[in-house]
């Protein structure tokens, strides 16, 4: 099905295999930011369409909590799905069915561990 599952992202227009900085797999937020802010009028066959988005049918990422956008559910921009809903902070843990896009969420993680501050320290 040519989907990619990666923690954060990648910056190489040739894909993660050609990534110059391997730390981008864990830290890159440009893929998410680009997908969310893309001009919807740019068609996939346009020379302006980002090449790295054409490499996969869908790309599933985390690392950038949707809470940064005041959203508590998975977000989609182009073919990029961000399913990090902030469980490391005060959000919920989320899983998604990649075929149907149905998703399930826990209660806020801190309700299970009230004494644990997580990344909210």
Task: Annotate the PLM regions.
Residues 1-81, 86-91, 98, 102-109, ...:
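Acidic, His/Gly-enriched loop-helix segments that form or flank divalent-metal centers
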């Amino acid at each position: 099905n040519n989907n990619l599952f990666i923690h954060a992202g990648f910056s190489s227009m040739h894909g993660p295999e050609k990534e110059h900085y391997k730390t981008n797999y864990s830290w890159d937020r440009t893929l998410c930011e680009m997908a969310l802010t893309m001009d919807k009028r740019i068609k996939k066959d346009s020379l302006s369409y980002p090449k790295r988005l054409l490499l996969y049918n869908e790309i599933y990422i985390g690392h950038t909590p949707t809470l940064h956008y005041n959203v508590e559910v998975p977000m989609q921009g182009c073919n990029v799905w961000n399913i990090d809903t902030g469980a490391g902070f005060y959000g919920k843990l989320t899983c998604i069915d990649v075929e149907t896009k149905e998703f399930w969420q826990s209660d806020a993680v801190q309700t299970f561990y009230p004494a644990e501050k997580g990344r909210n320290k």
